[in-house]
Amino acid sequence: MSTTERRRTSARRETLLGDQPGAFASARYARITPMKARRVVDMVRGLPVDEALSLLQFAPQSASETVYKVLESAVANAELTEGLERGDLVVSVAQVDEGPTMKRWRPRAQGRATRINKRTSHITLVVQPADVVAEKKATPKKRKSA
């Protein structure tokens, strides 16, 4: 197999998608607390891409802007690298991991200080064709034997 035939895949893509069609995008070190970002991500998980984008566009949460940008990026990756149609894409995986926390100090009365935790998030979204997602749900999971 020549180098032009071989398709380079990252380890991250292997863990998120395996050999199935789809694309992903992530925003790392986003200045949003993970709890607030998870509220927004939970709204779009499993939705068709167009519906999820319209939902995010008018969502009042501050995290919805960042999630919107990540979803747009994932759709663009699917269209350009995979050649998939935007209309039949579904948000199959949506996860928010905790990033590093920046510690800051706020002066208080009588010479004291309290700590402020400025939390960050790693937001990852995976888009796949609807038929692949439906097929994945239809296959039964293997049970662990004791």
From Swiss-Prot:
A single MF term (Gene Ontology): structural constituent of ribosome
Subunit annotation: Part of the 50S ribosomal subunit.
Native source organism of the sequence: Nocardioides sp. (strain ATCC BAA-499 / JS614)
GO BP annotations listed: translation
Top-level taxon in the UniProt lineage: Bacteria
HAMAP family for the chain: Ribosomal_uL22_B
Record protein name field: Large ribosomal subunit protein uL22
InterPro entries referenced in this protein's UniProt entry, alphabetically: Ribosomal_uL22, Ribosomal_uL22_bac/chlpt-type, Ribosomal_uL22_bac/org-type, Ribosomal_uL22_CS, Ribosomal_uL22_sf
Keywords of the record: Ribonucleoprotein, Ribosomal protein, RNA-binding, rRNA-binding
One Pfam family here: Ribosomal_L22
Annotated NCBIfam families: rplV_bact
Cellular compartments per GO CC: cytosolic large ribosomal subunit
Assigned protein family: Belongs to the universal ribosomal protein uL22 family.
Function: This protein binds specifically to 23S rRNA; its binding is stimulated by other ribosomal proteins, e.g. L4, L17, and L20. It is important during the early stages of 50S assembly. It makes multiple contacts with different domains of the 23S rRNA in the assembled 50S subunit and ribosome. The globular domain of the protein is located near the polypeptide exit tunnel on the outside of the subunit, while an extended beta-hairpin is found that lines the wall of the exit tunnel in the center of the 70S ribosome.
